[in-house]
Regions:
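Extended, hydrophobic beta-loop-alpha segments that form or line the acyl/peptidyl-thioester binding
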Residues: 66, 70, 143-147, 257-264, ...
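Gly/Ser/Thr-rich phosphate-binding loops and adjoining beta-strand/alpha-helix segments
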Residues: 3-13, 33-54, 109-129, 206-270, ...
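Generic recognition of well-ordered alpha-helical segments
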Residues: 57-61, 147, 184-187, 191, ...
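Active-site-proximal acidic secondary-structure segment that organizes catalysis
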Residues: 91, 114-167, 403-417
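Short amphipathic alpha-helices and their capping loops
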Residues: 1-30, 56-93, 112, 164-213, ...
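His-Asp-centered acyl/peptidyl-transfer active-site segments
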Residues: 12, 29-39, 56, 67-68, ...
Length: 421
């Protein structure tokens, strides 16, 4: 174990940003399994290894540049500290070190939201491991941090001017312009919540497992190839293809004619959020009336619904909570979809794939069960990774393990059939 001191330019306090508030509420609902939200990056230094002192220096400059990495959260507020010392763990294997650093839940009020580790070979650092508290960064925020760290190691300085910081984002969100954006989003949440079913998975499965939360992961090159072919054919993104397909299957499994999904949206479309090492991603509200039409026709109907969902994602969670409480009271029942979609890929490039290639890829599909735990803040979450692993994390009290597998196999069947039609 070693450490490195850092000294930033300012300190301060502010309410949580909308993105921080959203993930803070999810964390609170997931305790004691909130380590679920920790995530990491392994930076392989390759042909240009660093010295231990050089890696320590770069990590210190990174924490000084990005204030989220020295921000603590306590009692619903963020507290930015100017200086401190970052612990750095030494290890022999990057994957083992990543697992070690990611395993414990964070102490959000006392622990720096970045855990760092170095893998060495003799005097050289071959890998740098970073594990982020989700209050400090989301996936795209972590990529910004990785790019800056590489530039610090290579050139001694990061790129560009000072990036957006959480304190400044929080202050804008409380401004008149920020409240106008929040009000527009709240109107969408209220309008749609007055017409959607109270929740998506509403019939107990009668087959709850112990522990109740499980993840099924389908590695399917066929889904990847089929989604690309459909996206090119219809002039859309593979993410929209997958969101529409998941929605269609939820309708099929639940019997709902109107389906509400909560896609995770990056919220990095604005100049004052782009480039921030912070948690900007939030849930949008995607609502689709699933008609008795073919999948390609449903895809056309989904496009404007997706745009509305993306706009609604940049919202104040306090407004959303108020809207849900008011609508639930008016309707006489709790209203919440508990049905999420998270495309975690950083790029969405589609090529028109040959049908022979798609059919051949069907033989490469495999299913695993990589995770189980006691608590989750949702009933049904679909994740799409960069390796085209499509997973379902679900509460088996509402969707049994056989139903989870049936969903994933059905998703592959639907997309392949639509691609080859």
């Amino acid at each position: 174990m070693t450490s490195v001191p850092f000294a930033g330019e300012r300190r301060g306090d502010a309410p949580l940003t909308w993105g921080q508030r959203a993930i803070w509420e999810a964390i609170q609902r997931t305790v004691p399994d909130d380590h679920y939200f920790n995530f990491g990056r392994v930076i392989r230094l390759g042909a240009r290894p660093a010295s231990v002192d050089g890696a320590r220096w770069a990590l210190a400059r990174l924490v000084e540049r990005h204030e989220s990495l020295r921000t603590l959260v306590e009692d619903g507020h963020q507290r930015l500290l100017a200086s401190g010392e970052l612990p750095i763990v030494l290890g022999d294997d990057p994957d083992d070190l990543l697992a070690e650093l990611a395993a414990p839940a964070y102490d959000y009020a006392r622990e720096w939201p970045l855990r760092a580790g170095l893998v060495t070979s003799g005097p050289d650092v071959t890998h740098i491991v970073m594990v982020f508290c989700h209050l400090a960064a989301d996936g795209l925020g972590a990529e910004e941090a990785v790019r800056d760290l590489r530039l610090l190691l290579l050139r001694g300085e990061p790129r560009g001017s000072r990036p957006p910081q959480p304190l400044d984002i929080a202050r804008w969100q409380r401004s008149r312009d920020g409240r106008r954006v929040a009000a527009e989003a709240a109107a969408h949440w209220e309008r749609e919540h007055r017409r959607i079913p109270p929740t998506m998975f509403y019939v107990p499965s009668e087959a709850g497992a112990d522990p109740p939360i499980w993840r099924a992961s389908l590695r399917s090159p066929a889904i990847d190839l089929a989604a690309q072919r459909i996206a090119v054919k219809h002039g859309t993104s593979t993410s929209n293809v997958l969101l529409t397909a998941v929605t269609a299957l939820v309708a099929q499994m639940t019997g709902h004619d109107t389906v509400a999904m909560l896609p995770i949206v990056s919220n990095r479309f604005r100049a004052d959020t782009r480039g921030a090492v912070s948690t900007m991603a939030q849930e949008g509200l995607f609502v689709l009336d699933v008609e008795k039409v073919r999948f390609d026709e449903l895809l056309a109907l989904a496009r404007p619904a997706a745009l509305r969902a993306y706009r609604s994602a940049y919202h104040d969670p306090a407004d959303r909570a108020r809207v849900l409480a008011e609508v639930s009271e008016d309707r006489g029942t709790p209203v919440h979809p508990y049905c999420c979609f998270n495309d975690m890929r950083f790029a969405d490039h589609a090529v028109y794939r040959d049908d022979v290639l798609i059919r051949r890829a069907l033989g490469e599909t495999s299913l695993t069960w990589p995770m189980s735990q006691d608590q989750l803040n949702c009933r049904f979450c679909v994740h799409v990774s960069g390796t085209m692993d499509v997973s379902v994390t679900a509460d088996t009290r509402w969707l049994s393990r056989p139903e989870m597998e049936r969903f994933l196999r059905g998703l592959e069947d639907l997309l392949v059939e639509a691609a080859l039609r």
